[in-house]
């Protein structure tokens, strides 16, 4: 199960990208004394820094984003992260009411808090954060895009995803995977993926006729003296969640046996760190962590 420390670490990163923060950053924001240098403060730790972006949904500019009031967990997932909202979420993680983190992570009093804290997100702000981390870590950093990046805005619709591809190129990701990208159609996705300049990874996407892989499954990187294997896992239920006619030539699925083989092969090739860049969704990734052995880090998207 995810620990409180792990979750708050991830939440702090997300809140920082959104222009809010936890602890001291939250207090500065509440006092309207938050400056760019406070957001950019970064203490390098360890050999490798993983920077994970996911589910941008082609939103280029800051916006007001209200967390949902309902997130239903089924069976053993009921009442567990990420199926906690509002007061239950704040109680679980000891978040003060009306604080910056309460605004970023829960829905209560959203209108009044939004008037105080403002909009969230914006690719220009994300770019500033990424640039700062890259300056501190250099070749020891990996920037990984978890998908749901190219579509779901007016500009991405009008450009067939090209606007987001061009903008993301300025951030220089090392790899990505996908979900809503596939609604552009198989031909367009392949066209864009082949021109990215970095790998579109998806070990679980296959040609429906011959079961050949459509995309590379993994990529090995040398970072901080460590071989890092990044394995891509696209949204496994794409033909169910999205119109099947958009991707008639491809099949998906979790393909956990194939995933295990990718992990084993990466280890055999000397990987000291195996990262799953996933768009499974949190609940599926929890199960994957139980079933597939040898993965060290799962960067989870979709949920």
Where are these regions (language model features)?
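Acidic, metal/ion-coordinating pockets
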Residues: 2-303
């Amino acid at each position: 199960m995810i620990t409180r420390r792990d979750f708050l670490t991830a939440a702090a990163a997300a809140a920082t990208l959104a222009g809010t923060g936890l602890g001291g950053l939250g207090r500065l924001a509440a006092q309207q004394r938050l400056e760019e240098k406070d957001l950019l403060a970064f203490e390098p730790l360890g050999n490798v820094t993983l920077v994970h972006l996911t589910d941008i949904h082609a939103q280029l500019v800051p916006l007001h984003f209200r967390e949902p009031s309902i997130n239903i967990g089924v069976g053993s997932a009921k009442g567990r992260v990420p199926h906690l909202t509002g007061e239950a979420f704040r109680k679980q993680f000891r978040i003060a009411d009306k604080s910056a983190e309460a605004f970023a992570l829960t829905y209560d009093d959203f209108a009044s808090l939004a008037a105080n804290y403002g909009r969230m997100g914006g690719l220009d702000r994300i770019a500033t954060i990424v640039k700062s981390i890259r300056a501190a870590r250099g070749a020891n950093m990996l920037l990984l895009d978890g998908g749901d990046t190219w579509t779901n805005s007016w500009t991405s619709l009008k450009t067939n995803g090209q606007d987001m591809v061009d903008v993301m190129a300025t951030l220089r990701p090392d790899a990505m995977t996908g979900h809503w990208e596939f609604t552009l159609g198989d031909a367009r996705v392949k066209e864009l993926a082949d021109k990215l300049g970095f790998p579109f990874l998806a070990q679980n996407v296959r040609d429906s006729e011959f079961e050949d892989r459509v995309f590379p499954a993994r990529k090995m990187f040398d970072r901080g003296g460590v071989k890092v294997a990044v394995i891509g896992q696209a949204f496994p239920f794409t033909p169910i969640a999205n119109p099947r006619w958009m991707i008639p030539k491809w099949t998906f699925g979790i393909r956990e046996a194939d995933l295990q083989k990718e992990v084993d092969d990466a280890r055999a090739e000397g990987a000291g760190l195996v990262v799953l860049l996933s768009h499974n969704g949190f609940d599926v990734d929890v199960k994957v962590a139980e079933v597939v052995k040898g993965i060290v880090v799962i960067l989870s998207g979709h949920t």
